Each structure stands twice: as C-alpha cells, then as structure tokens.
C-alpha cells in the first residue's frame, strides 16, 4: 500500500450510490475504487446542494455573474471538509466547477503545507465572455487556479490545445487523459439488430441541442424515440412516437442497470450537439459504443479524441444539425442491420482498446505519482 492520503472531491450523488449497494457503473468515480485498493487512505467528499450559507450563496451568485465561471463554494466549504482536505497529500477535483469551488480552501491549506492538487477539466477554458470586463476578471480567477493547481487533466484534446495556446506558461501542468468507462458493466447482451428497436436520446448538459432533437423525432413519426433527460418537459414531446423518462445521474431516478437495458434494446443513439470546445456527449457515446449500440453524433470543435474515431467505421458523424441531413442519414442506416452490426463490433473494439477504466486509472496513477 502507498503511504499517502488521497481525497476525491465529487458533485453530489456518489455517497448515495455507494450506500445503495446496487450494481452500478464506476466511471463517474474517476478511479476512486481502484486507488482505494492501492493507497493507505482514500477519502471522498462531495457537494451538498442543501447547504444554506447565505453569505456564500450570495458570493457565488456574484462571482458567477461577474466572471462567467461556475463557483459553488456554498456546496462544499465547511469545517469538516476543510479538515479532510488539510490532512490529504493529494486532492483530485473531479470537474472544473469543483476545482473553482474548493480553491479558497486549497489556497489556504497550501500556505501551511505541501499537497498535490489536481483538477479534471470539462469546459473550463471553452466559455470566454465577450464583455472585456468579465473576460479580464475571468482571466484573473483562471490564473489563480492555474497557479494553485499542480495538474490539470483534460478529457478533450481540443480544449487542452486551446488552454495551451492561451496560457503557455502553464502548459507543463496540462495532460490529456481520455475519459474511460466501466467496460465490465457496459456489456451488450443482444447481438442481433433485428431484436433491437428505436432511437435513444440521453443527456443533460447545456451543449446538447434539445430543440433540434425534439424536431427530429417529430419529423420521423415512423421511428420510435426514447428521451432520457431532465432538460426537456414531457409536454414539449407531442409526437406519439416518443417515450419520455425524466432522468439525471445524481438523483437516481433511473438506475444504471435500467439504463443498460435501454441501451441494449436500442438500435441507435443520437447525440445532436451545439458547437463548443467542451467534450460534450462523451460518456453517452462511450457507454453506447461499449454496449454495441451505434452512435450518430454532431462533429464539434471540442470532439475529444478524433484520432480514434472514423466516420462510418466505428461511429457516425454529421457536421451540422439540419433536419433533412439527419433524417436522410438515419433512414440510410436504421434499417441496414449489416451496417449497424459492423459499426457495433468496431465500436466495441475501440472501447476495449482505448477507453477501458483501467486505462484511465493507469494514466491517473502516473500523473499523481510524479
């Protein structure tokens, strides 16, 4: 066992998932369980969205408004969490919102002791305000984070390149580690595409093109669609060919096992995206490919790892969200079981080679042991 103390800082929902003692996918724990087996002391703390520190709430709102950055210090700053962080040798903030929110505590701790502070990046450098005053303030906060953190783990290559270009003095801190999924959990059971049916849309982030997805389902009344999201109201889905499940990862309205079954029974997963440098749609794409369900996704500037994806070989790409183009593409592949089977097998092979959770763990271990 390695004699160091690691603390992972998560958004809400991880403790509930662990305590439920159900079978679930492990990728959104970012190798917490693997490192727990190797390090003497591995802790986790998480956001508590029920915290009601009025002062911090008001400060967060002001900082978000002025900088365009996601500060939620109210959800994480408290004495108990500070003590855990202070006793840690390595702290891993599992997204940039968390990194910004724990920043005041980390800076205070680093005045008194050495520790390694790592931040996983998912869009931190992709939201640049047009207002000069906001941009100046945002840069000030980003530079503070860049100086304080020891390592930045990018889940998308384009955002890493953008950050390296804008902040070259800190690029030695930047590392690309591909997001990887729990391939032991996401395993398909239905191999015959004649037994699969329907198109699945799933996701909640701000870069999904929800309106386009609804319009697409309305445009194809002869194909069944399933929407799993908390960002669309059921009343907006007026077509009879659409099923709706309100779902979000951290509220457990839909278990991972339920979701796996839906993937397994779907013929195609669609991921229409708005253009951004953020690697949006990543987890859904990888989960779907691991399940052998082909993915049709919008090619964006932030697509995370283009070298490992080939259009019409292990994935389907479209460059724009235009209804006629998407309808034409879906109609050309949806009824072609041989084509779907080929993409399915190639997609699963890509996951097993490049995006197993073991790969993420190995890369993370190398980084934190530097």
Residue ranges, per PLM feature:
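N-terminal subdomain of nucleotide-sugar transferases
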Residues: 1-50, 86-89, 215-221
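Conserved catalytic-core segment of nucleotide-activated headgroup transferases in glycan assembly
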Residues: 27, 192-259
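Membrane-proximal helix-turn-helix segments that form the acceptor-binding/catalytic region
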Residues: 33, 79-87, 132-152
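Nucleotide-sugar donor phosphate/pyrophosphate-binding loop at the beta->alpha transition
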Residues: 116, 125-144, 183-185
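Acidic anion/phosphate-binding donor-loop and adjacent secondary structure
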Residues: 161-165, 175-196, 211, 237, ...
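Conserved acidic donor-binding segment of nucleotide-sugar-dependent glycosyltransferases
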Residues: 204, 309-323, 332-337
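Acidic donor-binding loop of glycosyltransferase active sites
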Residues: 261-280, 293
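A short, well-ordered alpha-helix in the C-terminal region of glycosyltransferases
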Residues: 332, 339-354, 360, 366
């Amino acid at each position: 066992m390695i004699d160091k103390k690691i603390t992972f800082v998560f958004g809400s929902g991880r403790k509930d998932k662990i305590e439920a003692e159900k079978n679930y996918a492990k990728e959104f724990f970012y190798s917490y369980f693997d490192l727990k087996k190797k390090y003497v002391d591995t802790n986790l703390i998480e956001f508590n969205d029920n915290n009601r520190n009025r002062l911090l709430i008001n400060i967060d709102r002001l900082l978000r408004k002025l900088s365009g950055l996601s500060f939620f210090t109210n959800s994480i700053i408290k004495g108990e969490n500070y003590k855990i962080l202070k006793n840690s040798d390595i702290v891993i903030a599992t997204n940039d919102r968390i990194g910004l929110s724990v920043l005041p505590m980390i800076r205070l701790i680093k005045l008194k002791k050495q520790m390694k502070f790592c931040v996983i990046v998912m869009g931190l450098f992709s939201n640049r305000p047009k207002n000069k005053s906001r941009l100046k303030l945002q840069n000030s906060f980003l530079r503070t984070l860049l100086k304080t953190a020891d390592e930045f783990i990018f889940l998308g290559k384009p955002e890493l390149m953008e950050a390296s270009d804008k902040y070259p003095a800190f690029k030695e801190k930047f590392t690309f580690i591909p997001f990887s999924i729990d391939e032991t959990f996401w395993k398909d059971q239905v191999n015959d595409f004649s037994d699969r049916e329907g198109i699945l849309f799933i996701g909640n982030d701000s870069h999904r093109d929800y309106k386009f997805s609804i319009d697409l389902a309305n445009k194809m009344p002869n194909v069944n669609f399933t929407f799993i999201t908390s960002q669309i109201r059921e009343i907006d889905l007026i077509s009879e060919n659409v099923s709706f499940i309100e779902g979000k990862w951290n509220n457990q309205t839909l278990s991972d096992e339920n979701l796996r079954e839906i993937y397994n029974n779907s013929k195609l997963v669609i991921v229409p995206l708005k253009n951004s440098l953020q690697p949006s749609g990543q987890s859904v794409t990888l989960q779907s490919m691991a399940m052998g369900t082909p993915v049709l996704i919008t090619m964006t500037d932030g697509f995370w790892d283009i070298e490992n994806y080939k259009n019409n070989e292990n994935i389907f790409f479209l460059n724009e969200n235009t209804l006629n183009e998407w309808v034409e593409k879906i109609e050309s592949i949806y009824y072609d079981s041989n084509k779907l089977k080929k993409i399915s097998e190639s997609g699963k092979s890509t996951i097993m080679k490049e995006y197993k959770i073991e790969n993420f763990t190995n890369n993370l271990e190398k980084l934190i042991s530097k």
